[in-house]
A protein has these predicted regions:
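Short, charged beta-turn/beta-strand-edge "cap" motif at the junction between a beta-strand
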Residues: 54-58
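Short, solvent-exposed secondary-structure boundary/capping segments
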Residues: 68-78
Length: 80
């Protein structure tokens, strides 16, 4: 099952708001498997997602797709 990349990075708590996640995608700060991602691009388990925010780059691998925001311990189970 796939999830929109903006919803996924918000759900796993890499951004504080869904609109901030969409803005990061539109600004070219999110890459999926090396390619710049638009907010609606789907992610599936096994994809590599790079998010550049506040001068830091987070590189995570999708292990589980979710679209609802969950607690931090549950969110940590969705990526490596």
């Amino acid at each position: 099952m796939s999830t929109r990349v903006d919803a996924w990075i918000w759900a796993i708590r890499l951004t504080k708001t869904r609109s901030a996640a969409g803005a990061a995608c539109r600004g070219g700060h999110v890459r999926v498997n090396g390619a710049t991602a638009k907010p609606a691009q789907p992610v599936v388990p096994g994809d590599e997602v790079r998010v550049r925010l506040n001068g830091r780059e987070r590189v995570v691998e999708v292990t589980k797709t979710i679209s609802k925001r969950v607690s931090a311990p549950m969110a940590a189970e969705c990526y490596i």
